[in-house]
Structure formats: C-alpha cells, structure tokens
Amino acid sequence: MAKEILTFLTGISTRDGDKFPVLISAISKVSESEHRGLLNVITELRKENTPIANHIANHIDSFTNYDFAHLLFSDGTAKNTISLDNQLNIIQVADLVLPDKDTTFDEYTTIELLSVAMLIVISTFALDFIHSDRSIFKIVDLDEAWAFLNVAQGETLSNKLVRAGRAMQAGVYFVTQSSGDVAKESLKNNIGLKFAFRSTDINEIKQTLEFFGIDKDDENNQKRLRDLENGQCLLQDLYGRVGVVQIHPVFEELLHAFDTRPPVQRNEVE
C-alpha cells in the first residue's frame, strides 16, 4: 500500500530507473522497522543524503501540510487505528476534493491527488474487510457514493468491491442521491437489490424507472414513485420483482440517530 500511495503521489513509475529504486528501498527499510509510517519514509530518504533521495523526500514532504494529510502520513505510533477485528468501522472524510471523471491525471491539483490517494486507501481497507472470514456476512456502506463513482479510480474500485462482495459473502451498499450516479453498465449489472425513494423530478423519475428495468414512460409507474410516502420506497429484489415497501424502524433511537434534518425543521415537526 505504501508503494502504491507514494508512487501515485509523486508520479514516480517503475520506468524511472533513477528515482524508483531509491523510493522503494526507503519504503522497504521502513516496512521492516518497528514504527511503520509514511513520515518515516521521508526520514529514511534524508538519511541517504543524495540529490535524488533529498528531492523525493522534499516532494513527499510537500503533501504533509494539507488538512487531512495526517490520515495518510504518520510516524507509525498512531493509536486507535481502524482494524478488521472491529465489528464496526466508520471512516469520515468530509474534505475530500475529488477530480471530475474527465480530468486527466496531469491536470490533478495537489488536493485532488491527496483525495484520490485517500480514496484508494479507504477502498483497499474495504477490500481487505470483504476478503476476511467468508463464513461471516459483511457490509460495506458507501454513503454519498456519487463522490466515489464520479472519479475514474473510484468507479474502478467500486467495481472491485461489488465483484469481491459477491464471492466473499459481503454486501456493498451504494447510497447516493441519483440513480444516474451509477452509470457504468458493468456496475449496474452486479447490483442485486435496488431501493428508490420519492422523487418529484420527472427526469429523475424516468431515470430511476429505467434503472429498475421497467417502463419509464408508463404514467402509473411514474405516479407510484412520485407518490411514495415517508418511510416508503420502491424495491427491486434479487429476482427482478418490483414493489413498494414500508420501512418501520424497530428502535426509535435508530430513527433519531439517522435523522439528517436540520434542528429547526426537526423542532417544527415535533
């Protein structure tokens, strides 16, 4: 993982016969040490004290000053890190600035490079989690999944997650605002269960109905999606059957925990 992240950030490829061996050597030394962290790779490079090693060290160090860079760079002594042994891991990264799908790698800004690197780390952890004990059903929930699906690397990683999930008894949940966010056919074809909540936008309604594989121009189908009440959704099961289901929260605490309404609106309703 360290090799993938640092070569991605620095743009050093295996074809670079001068820089690549120096970087890999430093990473290998850190991986064999007691404290394994990307900051220590910078230290190891500076110990070499050669023009190439110092250049690479300075390049890597230039990424460490950004707000969420500490999630990638540490000295190897961090505690309370994410672990596959935990029953629940929640990873919140609110400041990711992911590039548009059409943006070329050469056009990435520094913050976009870091954001994609963070996405790669999160997805790799999710893949490791999926590939753990096959006898246990596991869930990977990607909230605001449009952010992942709107960047080329995220779309590729999402496909890997879904394919691995089917083989390793894991469910991958894509939670997003629009069915149009799931644009790639290969990903669509690997999604088993589909849930769609009320929409009043006719274009979004037609897009959702098409995603479900039912007649998007049928007025009854459109009305059914438009007239859904709170707590109801359109569901397509594993066999392709489509119907309206009502969701009843078993515990009131869960209802409050996942209530995303602003406090003012919540108080008015109460």
Feature locations, PLM:
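P-loop NTPase motor domains
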Residues: M1-R163, L225-E229, C233-L238
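P-loop NTPase motor core of the ASCE superfamily
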Residues: M1-R36, V182-E270
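Conserved P-loop NTPase motor cores
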Residues: K101-Q222, H248-F251, A257
